[in-house]
Structures are given as structure tokens and as C-alpha cells.
Amino acid sequence: MCAGIQAEARGAEALRATFSRNVFIPVTDLCRNACGYCSFRRDPDRARVISRSEAQRLMERAQSAGCSEALFSMGDRPWEVRGDRLELLEYLVELCELALEMGLLPHTNAGILTREELELLAPYNASMGLMLESTAHLKIHERSPGKRPEVRIRTISDAGALRIPFTTGILVGIGESSEDRIRSLEVIAELHRRYGHIQEVIIQPLDPKPGTESEGMHPPAMTDMVKLVSIARRILPLEISIQVPPNLMDPVPLLRAGADDLGGISPVTPDWINPERRWPEIDELRGVVLVERLPVYPRYVKLGWYGSRTKDLIKRLADERGLRRT
């Protein structure tokens, strides 16, 4: 699919971006938080846990579509609302094992996790993730104990101590100041300097949702996003990729400003966090040279920083550069 893009790109003007071909599997939409911009979370009487058979059907479609990543996402510490903690975590491990059997590398974003919980999941994941969102204490998070910055920083730090390749990022336009954005990026940079585990930082604009507190809010302007990506490129170590979601904003100006990754693009499932924002088709991104990667970045493929159970599949899927084998 990349060949058509490369034919469109011309000379030094071409922009280059990596991406991962994935399937997005929402494990559960039960969540202890009640963020003012979220339409993913469901109240306990409406929330559900995906069945193994449904997850397997999605993975089968992902196989057919040539995906290499299974993105597992769920609400924050749902067992504090309903259910058994160990039972859900063991089920998540079971889904990760199924993904590996089907040739898909798991990347799990399960919200706030303790070090013990990270240790349970890490062997079955090529990488993991948790958005920092902001170091500021914001009104929009006042009913969300899992969005306290110090709690999120602790999980990101614990992942670093365990050498888990990690994706994090900031959410832009949720009531934070420009200074807050810079401080958040500086904290991420410092965590990486300490542990070396941050593979990418997402700069994600708010997408206001009808029926939520964010409904009357305005997403950040493109000019502000371009400026922020440029600032992020100066603050973050060069080995950290800057990711921008291509279904939320035109990625081309942001790539020109210093972003270099488009994240997971799924030919199989919607973005369950922003389901009304469809993924672009790969060949719609004209003028961008797309390079397919795995959910674990080449640097960490070479370092061997990935879950022990993922090793054999990574060796099958990665080329000599650590990118997706074609």
C-alpha cells in the first residue's frame, strides 16, 4: 500500500512518517473516571467486556488485512467500579496470548497500573502506553481520580523501571495553559532521560463530544498545534518520535513542523475513542512517504526491550532495520 504514496511524493519535498497497521480491540468500556470529554466510557449498567469470540473475529479480520498490532484498550481500573481485578487482568493476558498465536503483537493501554500489574502484562506485550495528558490539575478531570498527574507519572515511571517500551502524550485544549503544555513535555523528557523507555509522544487535539462537558469547547487551532509540535521537537530527545493522529487533524502541516509518526491506522476497526473520526485510507495521505513499523519501535527491537513472549513473533515480523518486514 505504501508504493502508491511513494510514487506521489517528489524529491526533497516528500514528508516521511511511520505508522502501524493495527486492530483496535476495546476490552471494556467500564471506567472509574468520568472525564468531561469522553464518549468511550459507559455507566456500569451499560458497560460491557468484549467476548473472546468477538475479539477473535476482529483478530481474524486483522490477519486478513495484514495488520501487525493488536491494540488493547480499556477504561481506567474498571474493577474499582465492578468486577474482579485479577480476573480481568488474567483475561487481558489471555487475549494477548491469542493475539500472539494469530501473528499480532499486543500493545496494551489499560490506564493506571501498579508495578505488579505492569509486571503481569509486560511479557505478553511488544509495548504499552498511557497518556500523561497534562501535569496540570484541571476542572475537566475533577471526577477522574486516575487523571491526577502524579498517579499517571508513577505508572509511566514504573514502566521505565521495567524497561517497557512506552507510548505517552499530551491532550491539547482541555483547559490547560501554554505553560502547562510545556511543563508536561518537560516531564516526559525527564522520564525518558531517567529510564530511556519513551518511544513516542502523541500530541493529540481535543475532539469535543456532543453530550459531554466538552461539547461547547473549541478544539485547538492548527496554528497552535503546529507551534506546539515544533516546541515538542525542541524539548524531547531526538530518539523520541512525535505522533499526530491523522483522523483528528490534517497531519501534513504537523509533519512539516517536526512530527514523524501517524500512530496506528486500522483497516479493520474504528478509533473507539473517537469513533466518528474515521481513519484515513493509506493512499489518501498523498505526498507522505509512509513507512510501516511494528508497535515496538526499531530502537527497542534492537535493544531487545519487549515482552519475552513476543520475541519470536517480533523476529518474524521485523526487518534488519527493526521496521515491519515487507
Swiss-Prot record:
Matching Pfam families = Radical_SAM (PF04055)
Which Enzyme Commission number(s) are on file for it?
A: 4.3.1.32
Q: Does the keyword Zinc apply?
A: no
Query: Top EC class per UniProt?
Result: lyase
Q: Any idea which positions bind [4Fe-4S] cluster?
A: C31, C35, C38
The UniProt note on the cofactor reads as follows: Binds 1 [4Fe-4S] cluster. The cluster is coordinated with 3 cysteines and an exchangeable S-adenosyl-L-methionine.
HAMAP family according to UniProt = FO_synth_sub1
Q: Write down what this protein is called.
A: 7,8-didemethyl-8-hydroxy-5-deazariboflavin synthase
| Provenance organism | Methanothrix thermoacetophila (strain DSM 6194 / JCM 14653 / NBRC 101360 / PT)
